[in-house]
Amino acid sequence: GKPEDYDDEKDAEKIIIGELWVTPKTFTSDVAETLSCLRKEAKRRRKLYDDNAQYVGEFGNYLHIIGYDKDKEFDKRYGYVPGQIVEKINGGNLQWLEIFIHAPFKEDVETSKDKDDKNIISIVMQFGFKIEDVKDIVCKAIFAGDAEHPVWTHILENNTDKDRLMWNILLAPHHCSWTFFNSTSNKDEIVDAANKILTDYQIGSNAHII
């Protein structure tokens, strides 16, 4: 809800989400009942932008939609697409973090509508962490939500910079589900994309999957 309605005493056990990131699927009517409050909040925030062409957001009202609106991008004030580097969070410049967006792709957004597939539009990102007095990124982490192997195939097909897929930390895709590896019950089968992500992009021998 509106951040100005937050009551320090009554709402003490609640948090204000300064900046909300969602996919286009959030705005459809078929989201799970448990996500209805998230959809309501995303719609509230989007309306602030759509009602005022000069609005650029504020803490508790910031919104970013990751992906595409059919065949076009969303309003650049709140839209992010694959290949984009995020430079600000909550209106402030990122000093110690660099975020690169890999997915969801335009074709996967459309597939999610046709097949009611929520996993195919998972947000996939690389976080690059920095420390003071060191110019280069010192740790890279990949976060991929519920992305299954077709998403990783698309990422590899579209990626033009190997560094953007390198990782010291990989959050286990799709909560350790086998669908990261293939679409069958054959656990001896590992699709090429999964194998490459796990072997070709791991940084050193101290990388971790969590």
Predicted stretch roles:
Residues G1-A141, A147:
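Flexible, acidic/histidine-containing loops and adjacent segments that form or flank the divalent-metal
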